[in-house]
Regions:
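Hydrophobic transmembrane alpha-helices and immediately adjacent juxtamembrane helices
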Residues: 1-281
């Protein structure tokens, strides 16, 4: 921890702006790496645990919706069976798992690091980003497994996979914006984490991740897409990984715009509240 604080202290030196940003990026990378190492330190399976957790959720939802509720779907180039439904389901769940995990942990990122908050030299803007990026890295293991099984099943790798970094930007903007907002408010309102848990449970079932969007009545479907960025993000993941073509350009554009606005608002609230963190904690 002393090494992290010393590295943060360098950011206060009279460095050119570009060097300050590089120093912050290097510090953020160090914090994310340490966070990932600390999560499963001492466990036998280590970093395989995130993948096992993701696969367990996949099996549960596949069994519930595909076998019990008999939800069926057909995708171009893939057989119409329960395994294809599992791939479709996993493609939608991956961004959701990264989103909710990162947001939930970011909520307590400030109140859980009082020693860093009270260090004058530490850039507090990095704290909510650490768990968000850690969850994003963890979800990448599941993403690689998904792409592997899609390639085996469809005998092809879609060129649209190259567009995944663009949808990651949308996803990170949304998660970071809400993470900044929740982290800042939690310092003053300790009920925020519990409230957020309830909101995320409702949000999950309002988002067509475990069921196709076509089952939503048409008069409500557009509202679900326009007002809920996670709907568009989940559909774009499926477009890029499973289908090989982007069918939701408009929804993607709206989701990116909304996510950027949420990021700006969340960061501004966090920045406004930041001077009082040390006094409250």
């Amino acid at each position: 921890m002393r090494g992290v604080v010393r590295k943060a202290g360098k950011l206060k030196n009279r460095l050119p702006v570009n060097e300050q940003w590089l120093a912050k990026f290097d510090l953020l990378r160090t914090l994310v790496r340490r966070d990932l190492e600390a999560r499963y330190k001492g466990s036998v399976l280590g970093n395989l645990w995130p993948l096992l957790n993701q696969l367990s959720q996949l099996l549960i939802y596949t069994y519930l919706f595909s076998m019990l509720l008999k939800v069926k779907l057909s995708l171009k180039g893939l057989p119409e069976n329960n395994f294809t439904y599992g791939l479709w389901l996993f493609a939608g769940l991956l961004p959701w798992i990264a989103f909710t995990g990162g947001l939930t942990q970011a909520t307590n990122s400030v109140v859980g690091q009082t020693n860093l908050v009270k260090k004058v030299v530490f850039p507090l803007a990095l704290l909510p980003l650490v768990p968000i990026l850690s969850m994003f890295v963890e979800s990448s293991f599941g993403l690689m497994v998904l792409i592997f099984f899609v390639a085996i099943t469809s005998h092809t790798l879609h060129a649209t996979l190259s567009l995944l970094p663009l949808v990651w930007i949308t996803q990170l903007l949304l998660t970071a914006g809400l993470g900044y907002l929740a982290a800042g408010l939690t310092v003053f309102l300790r009920d925020i984490p519990q409230t957020l848990g309830v909101i995320l449970n409702i949000w999950f079932y309002l988002t067509p991740l475990v069921y196709p969007a076509k089952v939503i009545p048409e008069q409500f479907r557009n509202w679900i897409f326009w007002l809920n960025p996670m709907t568009a993000i989940g559909e774009i993941y499926r477009d890029l990984i499973l289908v090989g073509e982007v069918k939701h350009w408009g929804e993607w554009g709206v989701a990116t715009t909304v996510s950027a606005l949420i990021f700006c608002c969340g960061f501004l609230v966090y920045k406004r509240l930041r001077p009082a963190f040390a006094d409250v904690l």
